[in-house]
Amino acid sequence: MSQIKENPALVAAQEAQRKINQALDAGYSFRLEAGAGAGKTYSLVAALKRLIDERGSTLVQSGKKVACITYTEVARNEIAQEIEDHPAILVDTIHGFCWAFIRQFQKAIRDLVIELKDKKEKVEQSGGIGSQLVEYDLGFFSVDEMRITLNHDDIPELMAMLLAKEKFRMLFSQQFPVIFIDEYQDTHRQFMDAITDYFLKSKTGPIIGLFGDHWQTIYSSEYELAEYPIEEIAKGSNFRSVPAVVNVLNALRPELPQVVSLPEAKGEARFFHTNSYNGPRTNTAHSKEDLPSDIARSCREELMARLRVEGWDLKKTKVLMLSHNVLAVEQGYPKIVELFRGRTEQFTKKEDPVIRFFAEVIEPMCMAYSSSHYGDMFKILGARPAITKHEDKMLWRRDMDRLLKLRIEGTIGQVIDHLKITKRPSLPDRILRREEELISLMGIPEVEMSSRSQRYKKLREIPYKEVIEVTRFIEKLTPFATQHSVKGAEFDNVLVILGGGWNHYNWPQLLELLETKKLTKTNMKGFYRARNLFYVSISRPMTRLAVLATQSLSDTALLTVSNLFGSENVEELSFGT
């Protein structure tokens, strides 16, 4: 009778779960550090199920709950489904959770609003704080005599401000004896600082369980591990990838070694570079020593054709690109990229208020209207308008049909002008202020305008169709992706393109610093930012990984590559003369 082989990843996972259970039983806080493919969510759900089994009835009877705070709505839904929406557990996003708690304390919130960053002038212009209702709707800050509407980012900040007061800490601790925070490394910094300062350091209040991986911090500006005075539990499993890929991850991150489920599983991890290219390379502020965009594209296409011949199924292959200027031309928003050159986060992370409003409100609203999902449309708007007669409905239809037409045929400015007239929906204050500023500058030569006003004027002139395409990209509706858009995802095969075009990531420098370890105050933040994104990218494949570097690499950088991938898996691509 053949012996059943032990699953090393499962053994490591069980040991981590035992330590989580031990911490919960002893009543102390902990941090689960779960690398890529380790099954972080599985550990979190298992801990919740154990709490339900052992304390569920008692919690429900006492009116208390275990809070599970997630980073995304998708994670919230997944976890809630796994625990069958048990009444002893409150699963919600950081914004949903914080708002549900603080909305009970209207007077306290009103007193704190004036202390919020950049809000004092707005409040004073609107006549100050009285007895208005404080609400949180579309996520754009506004004040009038009836209500105060909070911004998206105000919610966790206000929560942190309330937790600074002992009265609210006591109420919070009474309601939530245990709090799990999913993706702790990406959770709002002020909220996490409040949790650390008022609960973890003092060892009072709720049991706090942090679940995440500080090497996968790619959304926030914090890239190093924050100081959490609690026990670390390392989960050294990788249920996703074959040994060939995990060996690269372990070489990159020896302090959290992972073991695989199937030690005999076949796969590959290879690195291709372009040092043999002798033609001119890029030399701009944001792209150094890279292949020209047309050469980079043909290089990628030829490599993919070769990989297909070698057995890759391209239907099961994800291309992760960082050369955003190349990607933009292929996806259909080159003018937006040109406008925000060097500041791509303005559209990729929706930091620009115009892009954010279009991507989060206008585009989803138009999609819902086009599909006749009117309930969804009004949900996006935040309220159902007063439609009391047939004429009201006809006016709505007329304005929406005109908006749909302008999306395809008009410019961004024409869409904004249409919304200024119809107020369906109303434009956020930040956009209205930019409009007023531009009107006040009429007749003034563009060279005399501020750079912000010049950029806004040029943004208005861009065809709105580019907004549709950039929104599709942001929402990952394309065959390509940048590394930011795939955190948490997995694919059979992955081709990672490391190139220039995004000033926050210097791949040749990253590879050099991994070897020399010469970190300074100047390069440290960039190093961690690039390292984390590189780790997230190369840890996505289940079976096959290929990395293509289109920038020239130094001998030091190539030494790092050989140490990570093995010299036998590193290849210099040849270019015809």
Please place each PLM-identified region on the residue numbering.
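The feature marks helicase ATPase cores and/or their adjacent C-terminal helical subdomains
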Residues: M1-T577
